[in-house]
Amino acid sequence: MASTASEIIAFMVSISGWVLVSSTLPTDYWKVSTIDGTVITTATYWANLWKACVTDSTGVSNCKDFPSMLALDGYIQACRGLMIAAVSLGFFGSIFALFGMKCTKVGGSDKAKAKIACLAGIVFILSGLCSMTGCSLYANKITTEFFDPLFVEQKYELGAALFIGWAGASLCIIGGVIFCFSISDNNKTPRYAYNGATSVMSSRTKYHGGEDFKTTNPSKQFDKNAYV
């Protein structure tokens, strides 16, 4: 029962993390920078993995999609690959989890389901690590440019998508670890010492022995009386 409850908790945590990681891909604010006037914000610069935009004080945005993939910076290409890999691994991890959980009717025996659940945990951990690496790589680029005194272009700050990605990656890793530990709970089967058969047999043996003794005595007496 405890193993089933832990698997349900792990599934909910992992799925929540996977949803958060998936939501970072279309999120706009991976990095953001604002130009403030004396009264209002005159412009907001922001970018994600696919485009860079500027929004003026009236709320009108002008966006420019990134050029060909071969012309992109290396860190953007790496972040794209890592985040897409994280989403894909989370999808397969959720399928493995559905087959490996005890509360489902698919997946075979309990032993086979425990192995599938452990595999789902490993896949979720890999998904979380990919997301964590991608967000950290992007954040490292932002902070390096921000604190570089020789960098004269527009400087950005960390956007909301990075924090969402880190949170989702943490949930995926936590859920995957719980899935991996659930296989140890499945292997702990209770052992019982059964000594009832020995006591029953010994009592039966004594009973039959006494019965034989009683039945043999009358036969001997009958024989003696017959000859007399």
Curated annotation (Swiss-Prot):
It catalyses: Na(+)(in) = Na(+)(out); Li(+)(in) = Li(+)(out); K(+)(in) = K(+)(out); Rb(+)(in) = Rb(+)(out). GO terms for cellular component: bicellular tight junction; cytoplasm; plasma membrane. Residues 102-115, 182-228 are cytoplasmic. The chain crosses the membrane at residues 1-21, 81-101, 116-136, 161-181. The keyword Electron transport does not apply. GO terms for biological process: monoatomic ion transport; regulation of monoatomic ion transport. It is a multi-pass membrane protein. The fourth transmembrane region (161-181) is necessary for integration into tight junctions. Belongs to the claudin family. PANTHER family: CLAUDIN (PTHR12002). This is Claudin-10. The lineage of its organism: Eukaryota, Metazoa, Chordata, Craniata, Vertebrata.
